């Protein structure tokens, strides 16, 4: 009831203005352990059936917040209090950049979806790392999503990813290389097996922390499988599928620029993930994101082979009790099917 009133006000504002107001509050809350604990007591949820050890990291539950919400790693402590099992900060770039011109964030309310053309706006890796350290350590694993600066030419992309990773080596529990945002010109062209192989070979030399590749939902299946295979062969520990889509047919009134996320992406993301899991389940860690807004969809992705999940748009539309609701219902679904833990359910449809 309370969030419905807050949501009505926020949705009366420009989407990015509303996001900035929420972020300001979350940054303030992050500075108060007392308030964070109060939030956790209200909206957190803990159940040993949902815990899992993955790549040496302890996840209280499989539900994470996707990159893009906390671009500068400045409100992580508050966000952990809303029931997430982990968070992904960023996207951080080596140098600060403003991103694309506003307006660049839009709601498609009927479809419970968002369209963003943000363009990796962030304060840069140095300030991002400083923000991260301010309230560390955190209660859950934190990933750092890394991107390429817009002004960097393709020929120097590898050097740019090396530079941003180097700035972030002493923060975060894992790293995600973002080659799949549609909002940086030609970035998706880097989704090819040669560049991906070079990228992960380079990163493996720099860190022992887990490395992930985030892929687009608009790749042809054969291309996607080839790119993922190249990443795994070069040392990637996991794949995050998927980023936003440029398929404008999924909403009634799309804007010209930007990628779509939310419920409009559910079917497309699920289909891509199904192909990914058929080929690579048990060969790497698979993370499913895109159009997950309830326990049923979350459970389906887990049974399809997802060790971890991420949400974003659903958090905007459903509010602070979303994680708690999904996780409570997920436990019921596990119990109904006789699973003693979420770990047992991972990939059940493939066995």
Curated annotation (Swiss-Prot):
Function according to Swiss-Prot or TrEMBL: Catalyzes the conversion of dihydroorotate to orotate with quinone as electron acceptor.
Listed cofactors: FMN
Protein name listed in UniProt: Dihydroorotate dehydrogenase (quinone)
Gene coding for it: pyrD
Catalytic activity: (S)-dihydroorotate + a quinone = orotate + a quinol
Membrane topology: Peripheral membrane protein
InterPro entries xref list: Aldolase_TIM, DHO_dehydrogenase, Dihydroorotate_DH_1_2, Dihydroorotate_DH_2, Dihydroorotate_DH_cat, Dihydroorotate_DH_CS
Pathway annotation: Pyrimidine metabolism; UMP biosynthesis via de novo pathway; orotate from (S)-dihydroorotate (quinone route): step 1/1
UniProt-listed GO biological process terms: 'de novo' pyrimidine nucleobase biosynthetic process; 'de novo' UMP biosynthetic process
Source organism of the structure: Helicobacter pylori (strain HPAG1)
A Gene Ontology term for the protein's cellular component: plasma membrane
